[in-house]
């Protein structure tokens, strides 16, 4: 991606280029061990139009790097390779299956004084291994969510089936990667939870129990409001990647106007005396259509004996969404979908209304929101809870931030420091732009704060962070 910054006079401009994907490939070194069979190792290669010998050469180089680094650390070979122009990331998700992502470093194109030639400056220090390493792991997790493991495809249909699945999935998925907006949130891969009072939470729990009792086919349920999680019956790691898919891919494709409450229905349908405007986000677009297809995406989640395959039904009313997961061995029919629609639609509409009203009341009590002097990111490693006032909104795969990239880089650097040690610690940085950046790590929790107080000193900054902890995290203990 290119950004132009007009820093030079007389029509001469600097061009800034953000990080971009150069190549992405998956190989298994055991598939073509003999000379002349090297191409058999390559299971997927993007871009596909690269000449065959170049693919073989690039994969061979990666094999050599992995083997070389294995001599120093047999259990943890290469993770990344830094060069002036690009950075390579290595990940072995399953035995002998390697994923490699090559990212072009950000660069600045500067015109020379003669106006003809140009000087290129590569900014290799701007790329963080932790961030882009996390992006590679996300790619595999997303593939596994919809296809199961590489080994499963091999058992079912051999190398040919695996290559077909990789091509089908990654051809589309890699187009949604926006590497220029990857940051600390990719490292955490957390879940944003919706704050609720006990009474409303109990209503939701009761709703989930009623649905699972009435529709015995439903094995797991997840409940979200406004793209934030309220309830989940899945394991944490499964919910983490499903949440990523829902909030960055599925929901943005089905946006609808926000509703103020139950008095302003979008397209009300009466079901008895209850408003009903629930709809399927996966599966049939319109239940009244005689040609409607009752096919749902299948997902793979962890189970006691490895994994289980499930139908994913996502059903939405207003800003509330319920995900129902049903064993893939069951065939879902029109009758079942109509039964679900009739049962869930009115109840979900009412619940969405109640949550909206409760949220509005709470906001009124807390008073008008003033532009705070600080922005923060919070993450809890134990329950994957994540909260950010730095990220304004998510669109399909893009997270828009409200602070300068230089400050996001500092947050990433602090996170790298935290990852190196097990002890709790605090780091305070004064940025070149006069912002203060504070990182606190305490008892499996991390808090990052950006303060816009250029005249403050260390003591004042420390006091501000204490105030923030007292107001935003009053029930969470942070060590001083």
UniProtKB/Swiss-Prot annotation:
Location of this chain's protein in the cell: Lysosome membrane
InterPro entries registered for this protein in UniProt: Ccz1, CCZ1/INTU/HSP4_longin_1, CCZ1/INTU/HSP4_longin_3, CCZ1/INTU_longin_2
Entry keyword Membrane: yes
GO biological process: vesicle-mediated transport
GO cellular component: lysosomal membrane; Mon1-Ccz1 complex
Pfam families xref list: Intu_longin_1 (PF19031), Intu_longin_2 (PF19032), Intu_longin_3 (PF19033)
Keywords assigned: Lysosome, Membrane
Record PANTHER family: VACUOLAR FUSION PROTEIN CCZ1 HOMOLOG-RELATED
Similarity remark: Belongs to the CCZ1 family.
Protein name: Vacuolar fusion protein CCZ1 homolog
